[in-house]
């Protein structure tokens, strides 16, 4: 006896164990005959495990037996129980892929309603003895593979609905009960969780989209995911960041072109805030590209259209809008974390501003009582030299317009070391060292007197003599032992020769 389930992904032909499980098979066949399973969704799909259906509400808590469903449609007589007792046999196990079982409700005694599942892998012995096996899929294993590969949410529900569109009974060996209801003409889709929007089983998301639009959609998705990744690792302030529209990127420059030359040429389009040619950090040679920041976006647009492929110092330059957000990222980090607490710009961060970190430490030290000592000028120590700002000819070129991974504004390890050396404990130790008494200096000078040096040299000389004499004695002892062994071997040879002569 067989039943065919027509799903949205293909057909499944199931052979039922009518002889071994008559009660379970009759309940399943009669529900199929009443079109109870029509348009039901597979609401629980676990990869390489099971695909569950048979619940009109698609929640896992609905469904009922044949007797309960018939009574709900035409009440007459006493109300039957919602579940029936299935046949759970040890001879029927979940050994092969495509095994059909009734889902047993965790009640006492265990019972089944209308929910069933199909195994998606072999040898799932965990389910043996817990659920009632009553059939096997004999055709349509490729359909099970499609169900197994479906994308699901965190609850196991496929993102695109997989539904049972129609059920065809190939053979029904059981007669209809006396109170059997009339067979409906056209099934109505049950209201299964209308609160969540899902892709319909008949819908193809890419069917009506042209190839160009589908490619554009794919590129936008990849760009959004890449931006989100850069935001997570800290290279972008936020995923939806856009590069500034008033900054131009100029490349293919002549190595002899200077900042002043470009600024003079581009200044006719509007006010220029900065014009910097990026240079090599070691040699100072031009890298043949520059960044020009205008006061207004309209001026940058005019320069973009008018200066494209213009001859500058015998070179055809290329002008485009800058795609770097490094300057924007640094300014946002410094504004959102001015005191240096945590983050990339804080004490232990990877980037940030050294002066801002020192100001934050000074504020905390002022609260704890250390600011007067640290901030007070020291007459014995000259003030530190001012830190020069990087110019267009400095190492690495410009400070404002680097690549996304540019991190030149981060403080060096020497700066962090200087900051640690300015801690109150180290300052206290330095004061103690500077204020130590002259008596200790005199004692140290006395320890280095010529007499003590002569005594120390004499002791070292005696120690070396003793070591040399000990080594000589050891060497002489080794020689004596070698001579004794040689004499013994010589005497042994003489005795052997005398014995041979006597025997002759």
UniProtKB/Swiss-Prot annotation:
GO terms for molecular function: peptidyl-prolyl cis-trans isomerase activity; RNA binding. Residues 330-504 are annotated as: Disordered. It catalyses: [protein]-peptidylproline (omega=180) = [protein]-peptidylproline (omega=0). Residues 246-324 form the RRM domain. It is found in: Nucleus. The keyword Ribonucleoprotein does not apply. GO terms for cellular component: nucleus. Residues 340-354 have a biased composition (Gly residues). Residues 330-339 have a biased composition (Polar residues). It is an enzyme of class 5 (isomerase). Residues 356-381, 416-504 have a biased composition (Basic and acidic residues). Belongs to the cyclophilin-type PPIase family. PPIL4 subfamily. PPIases accelerate the folding of proteins. It catalyzes the cis-trans isomerization of proline imidic peptide bonds in oligopeptides. This is Peptidyl-prolyl cis-trans isomerase-like 4.
